[in-house]
């Protein structure tokens, strides 16, 4: 795994301050250098540039990323196929209340099966072509049902992160139930991949009042269930630091579940617009762009073409790096320049 250099000194830093309707409302609207090459020394990244003074109120003003990196891009590849409930989950098909005599929804399950049969293998080849490393949020049951695929993800240099042992709403659990749930998630992923997860993503980002403290107790370094910033930051959980590497709804392929009023072309245009704005802001502010790819959605032929076009586009810009979320979290935890939120939501 490529590692970021030690955090830059703080001498020049500014003083630090002490699925469907839901996503349709939140997300509709509307290339990059690989971190491995960029940070290993054989990249085309430009030397560190002088940063223009940031306004006093600008979040995270001042230089942040090392080695001439201007903008970090963080990709989530959700490995959920095989971990979904047998019936009743979101899909392109109309909702049906199946009778008890119908134990599963075959049509929806074939849609999910595309994720592990075609989607992830196709995306892995795409990341390889561009030298991009991603973070794969893995449902434990999906990993157990398709262990070879989970191991292949890690073998190609990607991060295995937690996404629950199964598709469940953990916010409704007692503390003891949720602790067992989270522990099981760690065990299932580590047993198959050999990599112990240090990052976590709740189902639909819906965490409960005990989730963060439990993650911290279990040795997690970061979570992503937060949409409040375009950069990583630190919040306090039980008086101790816990890193947030924010997720995204706007740059999220889940909007394509229904296939109406949205398309791969719209997705491409949206992430390019997002990139352009964040790249511009990154001249004076620390910036991170998040993008989400689900196995059965972004792994389709037309979506891989859209992703490929975006990667080629971003490669035209100097100082852009794709980093795994564990890399981002470790750098954020160690850097004196990291934003420290006084509010923990």
Residue ranges and their predicted role:
Residues 1-21:
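N-terminal secretory signal peptides
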Residues 15, 21-43:
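N-terminal export signals
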Residues 46-48:
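Boundary of Sec targeting at the N-terminus
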Residues 51-67, 187-284, 339-341:
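Active-site-adjacent pocket scaffolds in enzyme catalytic domains
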Residues 53-111:
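N-terminal regions that are enriched for targeting/export leaders
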Residues 55-58, 222, 272-345:
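C-terminal domain-boundary segment and adjacent tail
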Residues 78, 127, 215, 245, ...:
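Conserved, mostly hydrophobic/aromatic
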Residues 100-104, 121-124, 128-209, 232, ...:
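Metal-dependent polysaccharide deacetylase catalytic core of the NodB/CE4 family, i.e.
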């Amino acid at each position: 795994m490529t590692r970021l250099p030690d955090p830059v000194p703080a001498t020049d830093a500014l003083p630090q301050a002490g699925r469907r309707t839901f996503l349709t409302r939140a997300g509709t609207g509307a290339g990059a250098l690989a971190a491995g090459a960029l940070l290993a020394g054989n990249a085309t990244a430009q030397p560190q540039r002088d940063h223009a003074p940031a306004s006093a109120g600008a979040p995270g003003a001042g230089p942040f990323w090392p080695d001439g990196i201007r903008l970090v891009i963080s990709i989530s590849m959700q490995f959920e196929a095989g971990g979904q409930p047998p019936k009743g989950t979101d899909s392109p098909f109309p909702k049906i209340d199946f009778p008890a005599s119908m134990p599963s929804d075959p049509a929806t399950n074939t849609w999910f099966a595309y994720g592990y049969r075609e989607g992830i293998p196709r995306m892995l080849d795409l990341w390889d072509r561009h030298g991009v490393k991603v973070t794969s949020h893995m449902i434990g049951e999906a990993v157990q049902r398709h262990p070879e695929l989970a191991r292949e993800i890690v073998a190609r240099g990607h991060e295995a992160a937690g996404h629950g042992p199964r598709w469940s709403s953990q916010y409704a659990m007692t503390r003891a139930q949720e602790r067992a749930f989270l522990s099981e998630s760690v065990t299932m992923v580590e047993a198959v991949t050999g990599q112990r997860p240090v990052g976590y993503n709740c189902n639909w980002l819906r965490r409960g009042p005990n989730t963060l403290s439990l993650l911290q107790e279990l040795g997690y370094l970061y979570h992503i269930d937060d949409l409040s910033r375009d950069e990583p930051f630190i919040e306090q959980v039980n008086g101790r630091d816990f890193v947030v590497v924010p997720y995204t709804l706007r740059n999220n392929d889940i909007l394509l579940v229904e296939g109406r009023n949205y398309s791969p072309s719209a997705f491409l245009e949206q992430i390019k617009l997002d990139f352009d704005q964040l790249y511009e802001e990154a001249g004076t502010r620390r910036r991170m762009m998040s993008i989400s790819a689900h196995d059965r959605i972004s792994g389709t032929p037309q979506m891989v073409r859209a992703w490929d076009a975006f990667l080629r586009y971003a490669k035209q810009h100097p100082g852009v790096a794709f980093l795994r979320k564990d890399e981002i979290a470790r750098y954020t935890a160690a850097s004196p320049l990291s934003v420290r939120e006084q509010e923990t939501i």
